[in-house]
């Protein structure tokens, strides 16, 4: 609870928590049994900045202690900063895979993963459904 900034809420009822606080509690519940692999589907979507920061810090800590994290996100800049390996998918198919550094080196006319996505798919991120 302390790592997620929730220690002072230990004796509070969960229905009084904000959405971001509930997201952090759910993440803590997911790691209670110390899984070797953790699957997360957009864990920072729709949360406040404080919760997002706490979640990312916690995930970095988990990863540094040996937990493999499979992390889905539509926020490619967040993925670029957080992930060591990235697969760019479009319509269920892998379009590119590698470390952020290797992907950026493989597509020299791009500045970030969003540019690579657009180059590979011909779609702007907002056009993707």
Feature annotation, model-predicted:
Residues 79-81:
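A short, surface-exposed alpha-helical micro-motif characterized by mixed small hydrophobic
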Residues 38-41:
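Catalytic Walker B motif of ABC-type/P-loop ATPase nucleotide-binding domains
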Residues 53-65:
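Helical segment within the ABC ATPase nucleotide-binding domain
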Residues 97-98:
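ABC ATPase "signature
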Residues 13-17:
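Conserved ABC ATPase signature
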Residues 1-9:
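Conserved ABC ATPase "signature" region
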């Amino acid at each position: 609870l302390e790592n997620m900034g929730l220690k002072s809420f230990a004796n509070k009822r969960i229905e009084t928590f904000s959405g971001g606080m509930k997201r952090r509690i759910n993440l803590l519940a997911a790691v209670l049994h110390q899984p070797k692999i953790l699957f997360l589907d957009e864990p920072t979507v729709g949360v406040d900045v404080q919760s997002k920061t706490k979640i990312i810090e916690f995930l970095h800590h988990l990863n540094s202690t040996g937990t493999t994290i499979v992390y889905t996100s539509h926020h490619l800049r967040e993925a670029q900063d957080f992930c060591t390996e990235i697969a760019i998918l479009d319509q269920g198919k892998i379009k590119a895979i590698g470390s952020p550094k290797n992907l950026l080196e493989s597509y020299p006319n791009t500045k970030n993963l969003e540019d690579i996505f657009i180059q590979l798919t011909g779609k702007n991120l907002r056009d993707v459904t």
